[in-house]
Structures are given as C-alpha cells and as structure tokens.
Amino acid sequence: MNILVINGHLDKESYCQAIFQTIVENIDSKRHELEMINLNEEEFDPVLRYGYRQRMEDDPFILRSQELIQWADHFIFVYPIWWSSIPSLLKGWIDRVFTPGIACSTNNRGSFILNYLRGRQFKKLLKGKTASIYATSMAPTWWYKVFSGPINIPDSYGI
C-alpha cells in the first residue's frame, strides 16, 4: 500500500510533529511505500487567489503534492484543531492541491461550481482511497461534540 503522511502543524517542535515522526518511523517499509509532506518545512502560497475560475501559477511543491495524492492509496493527516477547524496552512494546501481534475471532474462544460449547484454529477477521482486523522486539541472531546460536531477534514471537496 502507498501511504502519504501529511503534517499540518506549523510548529516544528509541536506534539503533532512528534506524532508525525512516530508514524513515519513505525510504518512497515516491507509492506508499504511511504511518502511524507511536512507543511512546516515547505514554502508555498496557501491562498487560492481566484477560486477555481482561474488557474494560478504552477508551484513545484503543489504539483508534487498532487502527484503524491494520485499515487497514495491511504492518507494520514496529523494536525491540531484550532478554533474548531484545521490550521489555515493545511486548509490552504487542501484548497491548492485537491482541485478539479485532481480530486474530481465533470463531463459538463462550464463552471465547475455552477454544474455542481445545478445537480450535475461529477466523477470522484480519488474514490477507493482511505484516510486516517490524528487531530490534537487542548479542549476536551465533549466541547467538540457539543459545539462543533464531528471532527473531520472539510467535506466540501466531494472526495
């Protein structure tokens, strides 16, 4: 199995970094292929400047991330929960990497968003892939159950 481990914490001395390192060190290399993305070591623009209506300039890190997303069978996300959500750096990476054509596609012409709103079907290009999430928080679990609902990666990508 091809496994991609993504660390979404900005601090290189964080508990998430320790979890990330432990996961990487303990994956059985005889049974699995492993790749890693440690967002706190990368320099990239996490801002999706034009939504998906206009293509942004190619960024080598984003292109490599998209290759790894297509390569992986299983994703492991490690990140803290801040303000009941994922860190902005991880959110920006998801916005820039899980784009139409990588995460999903439509056979219809025109705007991806308008086609979606009109109920037109789109193909899930990552179907069959799995993920694990290691999310840390300083708040008790009941806080998220009461105020935020289930903790998950934003599901607006149709993955």
What positions do the PLM features span?
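Short beta-strand "acidic-cap" motif of Rossmann-like dinucleotide-binding folds
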Residues: 36
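N-terminal beta-loop-helix "entrance" segment that forms/cooperates
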Residues: 39-57
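A generic structural signal for short
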Residues: 11-12, 53-54, 144
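Short, solvent-exposed amphipathic alpha-helices that sit
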Residues: 18-29, 147-159
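N-terminal beta1-alpha1 ligand-phosphate binding loop
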Residues: 1-32
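Cofactor-binding loop segments of dinucleotide-utilizing enzymes, especially the Rossmann-like FAD-
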Residues: 8, 39, 136
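Flexible, glycine-rich phosphate/dinucleotide-binding loops
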Residues: 12, 43, 140
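Helix-loop-strand module that forms the ligand-binding subsite of alpha/beta enzymes
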Residues: 57-154
